[in-house]
Amino acid sequence: MNFIKEFREFAMRGNVVDMAVGVIIGSAFGKIVSSLVSDIFTPVLGILTGGIDFKDMKFVLAQAQGDVPAVTLNYGLFIQNVIDFIIIAFAIFMMIKVINKVRKPEEKKTAPKAETLLTEIRDLLKNK
């Protein structure tokens, strides 16, 4: 019973719950960005490059033989995933910049009175 109680306390701590929410939101955000790239950016980029569809770009290493499918290097999908990554990284970078601007700067730690007094005494003794 002690193990279950410890696990519940661990799982209900703010950091774990915050991380879980972040992972879920990040997953949903990744799907949105993937859709943005594959459904909006890639077709426009295809039109600009003369009707090329990146999803179909591949090198055929071995032709299909009977029931065995062709062996291919799908570099078009790789390009699409790189674009996904760049957009996600940029969005996260912008969010972090906004969060850092919104956060209040940490107040400078002031020295305790005794430490300040000793520093002043030291400085006075130095000057004599």
Swiss-Prot record:
Residues on Cytoplasmic side: 1-16, 95-128
Gene3D superfamilies found in the cross-reference section:
Large-conductance mechanosensitive channel, MscL, domain 1 (1.10.1200.120)
Membrane-spanning residues = 17-45, 75-94
Periplasmic-facing ranges: 46-74
Q: Does the keyword Ion transport apply?
A: yes
Domain of life per record: Bacteria
The Gene Ontology terms for molecular function here are: mechanosensitive monoatomic ion channel activity
Single GO BP term:
monoatomic ion transport
* Keywords on record: Cell inner membrane, Cell membrane, Ion channel, Ion transport, Membrane, Transmembrane, Transmembrane helix, Transport
Cross-referenced PROSITE patterns, in alphabetical order? MSCL (PS01327)
What is the membrane topology noted in the UniProt record heading this document? Answer: Multi-pass membrane protein
Q: Which GO terms describe its cellular component?
A: membrane; plasma membrane
Which HAMAP family does the annotation name? MscL
Family indicated by similarity: Belongs to the MscL family.
Q: Which NCBIfam families match?
A: mscL (TIGR00220), PRK00567.1-4 (NF001843)
Subunit text: Homopentamer.
Known role: Channel that opens in response to stretch forces in the membrane lipid bilayer. Forms a nonselective ion channel with a conductance of about 4 nanosiemens. May participate in the regulation of osmotic pressure changes within the cell.
**Protein name (database record):** Large-conductance mechanosensitive channel
Q: From what organism does this protein derive?
A: Haemophilus influenzae (strain ATCC 51907 / DSM 11121 / KW20 / Rd)
